[in-house]
Regions:
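Peripheral, non-catalytic segments of secretory and membrane proteins
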Residues: 1-81
């Protein structure tokens, strides 16, 4: 796994463990992290799937500002891979 994906997974795991983030956002972050770690699928497929999932949750009105900023950071890193 590349360093960028490791960095992204680390941020997603932080969101997953953050209690101030709503459960649906934490679950989506956890699923995204697991998808990125799944070596059986092609990297471009994994990244595009995660981009779609995270883009959807970044528009959730209940997401705290700090978590939204982290998700935007993840999206930016994934788009640059």
């Amino acid at each position: 796994m590349s360093n960028e994906i490791d960095d992204v997974c680390e941020i997603l795991e932080y969101i997953t463990n953050e209690n101030s983030v709503p459960r649906n956002i934490r679950e989506a972050a956890n699923e995204s992290s697991q998808l990125l770690k799944d070596e059986e699928k092609d990297q471009s497929v994994r990244i595009s799937t995660v981009l779609g999932k995270l883009d959807e949750i970044s528009n959730d009105p209940n997401i705290p500002v700090h978590a939204r900023t982290l998700i935007w950071e993840v999206l930016s890193k994934l788009e640059s891979i």
